[in-house]
Structures are given as C-alpha cells and as structure tokens.
Amino acid sequence: MQSYKLLDKKQNSSLGFEAERYLLEEYNSEHIHLKNDSKELVFMVMFRTIPEDSTGVAHILEHTTLCGSEKFKVRDPFFMMLRRSMSTFMNAFTASDWTAYPFATQNKKDFFNLLDVYLDAVYFPLLEEDDFKQEGHRLEFSKLDKSSSDLEYKGVVFNEMKGSMSNISNTTWQALTKNLFPDLTYRNNSGGEPKDITNLTHDYLKGFHQKFYHPSNATYFTWGDVDAKEIQKFIDDKLAKRFKKIPESKLEFVEKQKDFKEPVAATEAFNPVSKEQVGFQNYSAWTLGESFDINQLLEAHLISLLLLDNSSSPLYKVLETNDIGKSPAQILGLEDSMRHLIFICGIEGTSEKSQDKFNKLIDKTFAEIKKDGFSESQIESALYQLELNRREISSSSLPYGLQILLSMAPGALYKSDPLALSNIDGALKQLKENAHKEGYLQNLIDRFFISNKNRVNLEMVPDLELINKKEDELRKILDGIKSSMSSKEKLDLVNDAKKLADRQNAEPDKEVLPKLELNDVPKSISFPKTKKLATFGYSPTFYEQPTNGLTYNSVSKDLNLSSLEDVNSLMVLSALFGKVGTKDKDYMQLQEDISKISGGINASNHFYVDKSGEVKGRISLSSKFLPDNTVETTNLMFDILQNTDLEDKKRITELMFQNFMGFQQSIVENGHRFAMLGAASLHNKLSYVQENMGGLSAIASFAPYITQQDEMITNQLTKVKDFYSNLNEGKDEMLFISNHKLSSEQLDDIRKINFNKTGDSNVSLDFNPSFSKVALPLNTQVNFSALSLDAPIYDAKESPKYVILSSLLRNEFLHKKVREQGGAYGGGAAYDPFSGTFKMFSYRDPRFIETIEDFESSLSWAALGSFDDDNILESKLSVLSDIDKPSSPAGEAFKDYRLNSEDKSQKARQEYRKNIMEVTKEDIVEAAEKLKSQRYSAVSYTHLTLPTKRIV
C-alpha cells in the first residue's frame, strides 16, 4: 500500500466522532476520515473544477462521467447501481468551483461495490460522444426521421438549465456572483447558460476531465464505522500507479477577488412566473471574509443571525416594514458555499427606479445599528441559535455524515485545515466572549458593511416576455443552422438520431456491475422505542433518542374540515402561527421570545386515510431547544395554538404576501410535484385537500393579499377567525424526543397546561371525483407533466405489489423513455399508499403530449410482463433501500410517532416490508393490468400556448 501519512487526529466529542486527516504522499492528496459508530457509511471524492465560461462543462462532465467507465462498460452504471444496491444516498454535485461524487449505504459489501463504481467512473470514464450528446446537447429534428421538420436542441443538462434559469432565485444569484466576482470563476454559471451550453464541444469536455479529475486534485472524505486503512488500500489498488503527481504549484486554485474601489451597480431582467409577480426586486450584496477561516465564518454567521433571524431583528424588521417594497426577498442572508462569504439582503414588490431608495435605507439601517449596537437579549438569542445549529443532527435530505463532510470541504478546497471547520468549540467559546465586549459587534458591522466597498447593488427587472424572447432568439439560430445545412448534413443528422436511439434502446450487459442479493438485505429493521409519560390522565409520548443534547417537541390537534373554505382558512392560519402576536404579546415580542428559548416554532399540517378509508388530519407546532427550556417552550407553543391574535390586518397582509412570493418561486423548482398533486386532486379526496392547501389552487387564498383589497381581506379573515374559534375543539397530542428525560418538576409544570383530551378528526367536505386531462400555462421554458390513477391504500393486502410496480416502471421504462430519449431532466412513477394514488411524472421536460403517451405505454409494457426476475430484484432493492434509509435520531422518532398515530404500527410496517420482499412477477402484472384498465387524470404545466382549464 502507498504511504498514507497521518497529519492530524482530533476528537470531536460534541458531534461524536474522531477526525483523522491523512496525506497520500504519492499524489499529495488528502483523505479525511470521520471515525464513529454510525452504520451508515459515507464516501465522497471532491475535485476542484474551475470553468472559464458558462458552457456548463463541469456540469455536463459530471453527468457524462457517470455514463460508463473502463471497468463498467455499460451506458448508465450510475442509475443501474441505484437499483442494484441498498444505497441510502447516491448523487453527484457540481458547484461553482468544485465537483463531488458522494454516496452512502448501511451495507459494507455495498459500500465497496459502490466505491469501485464511483472511482472507476471519475478516473477512467469512457466519455463517449453519444453520451455527451445525450447528457449535454445535440441537434435533432423535431420528428427524428423527417429533415423537413423543425431543428431543435436537445440534451438532459440543456433542458435542466432551461428550467433552472427560469427561476428568479437562480437568475438573481447568477447576476450577483457575476458582478461580485468579475475576475474569478464565480462570474460564470457552472451549471451552464442554455445559450452557451450549445457552444461546448466534446473535445473540450475531455480536456477538462484530464485537467481536473486527477488524484493530485482530489480530496477523499469518509464517515462511519469502517477502517480508514481498508478504504485507502482500495483506492491505492484502483489507481495502481496510473497517474503521476502534479506539483501543487501546477494545480489551479480560486484566488481572492481584488477589492473594489467603489460599489458596483447592476441591472438584470428576470422571468416572472405569473402576472402577480411583476414587481421589481432590489438587492445589496457584500463579500465578507473567507469560508475556510473558522473565526471569520462564525463571525459572519453570528452577524447574519443578529440581523435577520426573525421579525424583531433590526435588518429583517426594516425589510418587512419599509414603504419601498412588499416583502423581504427570498434570497437573504449568508452564503458560505464558495471561497468568499457573501451576505445578501433584498426586497420584492418594488416599483421601477427604487434601487437608490433601497440603498439609502440599508445604509441608514447599518449606521443606526453601529450607533446603537445590539441588546444583551439579542446577542444571547443569536448565540443560542448558533449553539442549536452546532448541536443539531438535522433531518436533511443528505445523510448526516455527508452534511458534516461538506461543512469541512472549504478547508480542503482552499488548502486550509478541514478539521478546524467541524471542531468549532474553541472558536465558538472565543466568539461568545468577544460578542459581549464593548464595540466588538459594531466594529463587525462597520467592517462587513459600512466601510466595505466590495458591494453590488442589483435591480431585478421583471419581463413577462423574457421567455418568449429567448425562445424566438433560439428559433432564429436554429432556423439559420438548418438553412445552411446541405442535404447530406441533414441526412447525417437523421442517421445520428437513429444511432443514438438504437444505443439507448439496446439492452446493456448489467452483469458487469456488482449487485446485492436479497439475502444481503436484513430480514427486519429496528424502530425507535417509545413510552408514555404519565401526567394527569393525559400521557405525552416520549422517545429517548441520541439527539446530541437537544430536545424536540411537537404539539398537535385534530382537525375538523367541512368545506373548502375551512381548508383555505387552515392554510392561512398555518402561515400565521408564531408570526403574528398572541393576546398578551405583539408579534415583535413573540418573535423575540421564540428566539431566546428555541430554534423556532413551525406549523405544519398532515392528512392521511384511515383503515376505513376516511380522510383525517392534524395541525402541529414543532420546535427544538436545550432541555432547560422544555417547559417554557411548551407553554409558548400552546399559547400560540390557543391564543393567536388575528386582528393585525397590516401584519397579516405582509406575511401572506411573503408566503405568496415564496410559493411562486417554488413552482419552477417543484413543478413535477405540483403536477402530480394537481392530477391526483381530480379523483382523490385526500389529494384534493392537499392540493388546495399547498398546490396551485392555493393561490386563490393569497388573492386578497396580493391585490390588497381591504374588503376581500376582511371577509377572508372573518372566515379564518370563525375557523380558529372551533379549532380548539380538537384533541391535543404532545411529543418529546430527547436524550434527556423530563424531570418530575418539568412534568408537574406541563400538567398545568390546558389540554383538550377528547375529540377526533373529521374531514367531511364535499368531493366529486372526476377524470380529466388538463393543460395549464406556466411561464417557464420547460414542461412538467403528471398522470394519476386510483390505487389501494396502505392497509390493503395488494399494496406491496404497487410499490414494486412503481419502482419497476421508473427504472426499466420511464427513465429510458422520458429522460434518455425524451430529454427531460427527470421522470418516474410514484405510488402513494397513504392517499391511495399511483402517479407518473416528468420534470423539466421539453415534451408533454408524448410524455403522457409514454406514461400510458408503461402500463401496457408492465401488463405484458416485459421484464425478468433480475428487474424485479433490482426494484425490490430500490424500494427496500428507501424504506431502510435512516433519518436523524429525531427524524426517526417523528416518523414513528406519525405512523403509529395513523394505526400503522411497527409490527404492521415490519409485515409490509416482508410482503414487499415476497412480491412475484404475477403480482406485478396483475397490478399493472388493474391500473391499465382504469381511467386516469393528467395535468401538464406547459410553456406552450394552449387552451386552458382550471384544475378544480
């Protein structure tokens, strides 16, 4: 084995691991290993990748790298391994100046299988031209075999970025970084600008790989209960002296941006999703310090919390209550993902030429903060939030180990100390001392903002025709290319399309890839243990979990909904809980109190179908805090639930407008989810309720606040108040999750809370199912489509068949048809046993009618039994990996509590998992035949101009 030199070893008792930092001397690359008792093993290899333009070369390379390698000569090893392993996470990330390839699994055999595939992919990829065309960009005729049809650009990344750059948040971010970093790679769009992607060549892509995907430019990160030396030997054997060390002086690094002499003014157009979003937006952004310096990083986080944590924070208060705009911007606060730290503040809903007013408002605010400083209460609250953030094992979509590893990445990327970025106790202690020193925080305000010339003032200008202009420009380019093509060139293009389609349709030799068998999968899984806390005839539920010193709490109440007006009122009320005042506190005081004792109090709603098929629902408030604040936070949660004040019409209007803007900006990123919910809502009662709560139909509830029509607002608030007055009739439930048991004194205090111990949920609103095909316009450059059918609920004996069918359709049919051939960024099938719906969807899709036809064809394909036992095994592995995927300790407890409350006991879930493992081919064919024989609903959100119809 090559020489791995141990550079450093640090015990991190706060987060429960020992960090080891190794140097592989042969290549001068580092291995960061976080040793702990976690069964979820995580690996990540990261390369510095520094693009010179916005062709998306790093992004397209990330995709193409995973399309076959020297050892694994199959077209799509990445997606194949998703279903041949028990991975709890597999992905690849392209950032502004790095590319990473992470995975996680709880199976050690699986870990080394995936390690083999990943290392072969990044170091020895095939990078074939057909894969470049499929994943990046290509020219094709709209009708592949007819050169008389329109010429089109296709490609997975091309369509992904058309969708991405339709989103105002992404457009704003690119505008800010372009102007903040005129000399650095950050000025480019590493994902790719659609108009520039088509300039990328296959040869340039291969050269980019050769330059950056080298062991000397790599850092390896690992986490879990696995020996570092075992991993190091595997990496050594894989590399096998096939590379020569590149001296550090020859490697490329991102340098510091030169200081500005004066702030920069900039203007950029953006694409509003709808006419309601046509207001201007104004921003100011500063570069502060460097992300790999733990002291600068913590200082910046503390200042960001002090300024923006809640409505009582001085800068956030100004952004909410000024007379220039209607709400704080969606992009707000500290960004620490690059070498330079960036702080952003902004407002939405302004008028033209408001930038100077906004700049003066911000300058005045910082001058006042420097003069007055922060109160002791504000400082303690911000430090408390830092402490909570440090301790929390969050329930992110990323594995916890990967979250920790990514937090250390700046130290490795910029040749600093990665271990210092995770072991922050010493730096945090020093920051706490400094924060209370006179003038310290005011000096940071001056240094970061007042005296800092490294600032961009950006005006975002709405243009409802921006998408059409881009499409017209692209059409002119394509028509020009076509008019200059010879007959032979057109024929070659037709033949190239046929060749690519034949390649996509060819059956790969999957057996070259490693895989698990069912006997590698545990027969059963473990669940968190629960117990009831005896109080006074009411028993809160308690889970003792390793929460790293935090306590999590949830208080919930049964819902009674008898009309669509009730659903709309619930949506509004949920957005207001904790954000408006209570009977005894105005909203500023309430926000301040919440921040002092907790990590925030958040409202959510959950609906489910019980065993009898009836829809039930609950509203919940949840929080996290240090154990000493258990009683105080619980009392505050019940105060909010029972005594919220709904009289401050101005505040409510501000909050609802903020919610609307956030909702609008989520549409492009989550268009497939809106389409699935919309399609299911046409024929399924539970989905109908959910769609009116959080789908596009919910926009109607925002209408009075967007138009600011006083009479409409008054009328709606009257309905909300009426609904709220009946809310407390529902039964209360309470949950605690902690590694600290509640003391007898705390239980005594909780006894004094006014609980409602009786009641039941009843969602009885009228619903008339229908099956329709609906197309709705959406101002983006791509489409989102979904189809939905009735299916059995969780408790039905045949339910496991549909779970496997959905996985089979996604992996074996829709991935090929919708993504590879159709060019969509994503597509698949999803069975929801909790609502009783079976859905198919596409994401950032250039097509829509053809995609719906593919959805229909998938069921015919499955009903004919056009799959083998190996396909079934892969589908089972894919499903079981989702079921077995661990969450955070608190997340596991929340999930168990919710399912138990829905009569899905641990025993029933264990049996359900067992039944999934026993599904046969005949079962799958039977399920497909039943679905195929049904009517379905379909919804497409499309950029095409079509006759439209409302969803409901």
How should each PLM-predicted stretch be described?
Residues M1-V42:
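Non-catalytic terminal extensions that flank enzyme cores
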Residues E40-I50, D76-F124, D131-S142, N170-K195, ...:
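M16 family metallopeptidases and their MPP-like homologs
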Residues T942-T948:
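Conserved small/polar residues in nucleotide/adenosyl-binding loops
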Residues T55, I60-H63, C67, A575:
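Active-site recognition of the HExxH zinc-binding catalytic motif
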